[in-house]
Regions:
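Secondary-structure edge/capping motif, primarily at the C-terminal ends of alpha-helices
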Residues: 58-62, 114, 137-144, 176, ...
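Alpha-helical bundle segments that constitute or directly flank the non-heme di-iron/ferroxidase center
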Residues: 13-17, 31-61, 124-134, 203
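Structural helix-adjacent loops and short alpha-helical linkers that scaffold large soluble proteins
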Residues: 62-68, 181-182, 186
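A non-catalytic, amphipathic alpha-helix used as a structural packing/dimerization or gating element
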Residues: 39-50, 73, 77, 187-194, ...
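Active-site-proximal alpha-helical scaffolds that flank and shape metal-associated catalytic sites
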Residues: 7, 66-164, 193, 197, ...
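Acidic, carboxylate-rich catalytic segments that either coordinate divalent cations
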Residues: 189-219
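Short alpha-helical hairpin
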Residues: 7-32, 51, 170-179
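Long amphipathic all-alpha helical oligomerization modules
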Residues: 164-193
Length: 219
């Protein structure tokens, strides 16, 4: 199954670079620059807009009607995550909605373009994003201290909404992996690798933001 193949990639250089990225390490340690975190929250909310649209486009095109309601619930969960970011962090830190960074713009454009491709491709990139986030948050759990100022972020991002989205997409992507041929499976792995690279670029952008002082302005 596709999820089993991906899970065997835990030690791959790209996934290791994501898990050990300074942004994620410092977030886990509670030492991350607050301006970098604010920039990340702003961009993550903008990213989720594109991710939600990708889910909804996929829902409208998916062949198996049994997957429609579960996928719609994943979209609903992602909307709840986005609302949490805006209601909680935007208020606490005075974050404005702003514009997409180049990394966020490229990532969401990639997702939306794939949503109009074959359905198995759309499901693959949606699952890849969930898988990578789960890998990162699972790795963080053992290192997070109760007094870490970012602990509510971890608690929410490793909570039931994300778990449901991950499990649902894993179930659907594995069904597609069984149905498609060898070439399509290779394409699924390629899409996972591309998604992981976009994720890495996203964290690079957040971590290096303060260095370049390029906080996108509000519309």
């Amino acid at each position: 199954m596709f999820s089993s193949i991906i899970k065997s990639c835990y030690g791959s250089n790209l996934l290791r670079d994501i898990v050990n990225h300074p942004f994620n390490v410092e977030l886990m340690n509670g030492t991350l620059n607050i301006e970098s975190f604010k920039f990340y929250i702003q961009q993550d909310a903008l990213f989720l807009d594109g991710y939600i649209r990708t889910i909804l486009t996929t829902v409208s095109r998916i062949e198996d009607h049994n997957d429609v309601i579960p996928l719609a619930k994943v979209a609903q969960g992602s909307i709840a995550v986005n609302k949490f970011l805006c209601d909680h962090y935007f208020t606490i830190y005075g974050v404005r909605r702003g514009k997409k960074s180049p990394a966020c713009f490229n990532f969401t454009n990639f997702l939306l373009s794939i949503s109009y491709s074959d359905t198995y491709e759309a499901i693959t990139v949606l699952y890849s994003c969930m898988f990578i986030y789960k890998t990162v948050t699972d790795n963080m759990k053992s290192g997070f201290k109760e007094n870490n100022k970012y602990k509510d972020w971890l608690d929410f991002y490793s909570g039931s909404l994300m778990e449901y989205g991950y499990a649902t997409l894993e179930n659907i992507v594995d069904k597609y992996c069984k149905k498609v041929g060898v070439n399509e499976r290779s394409r699924m792995l390629e899409l996972f690798r591309i998604s992981a690279q976009f994720e890495l670029d996203f964290w690079n952008s957040a971590y290096n933001f303060s260095r370049f002082n390029q906080f996108p302005k509000e519309h």
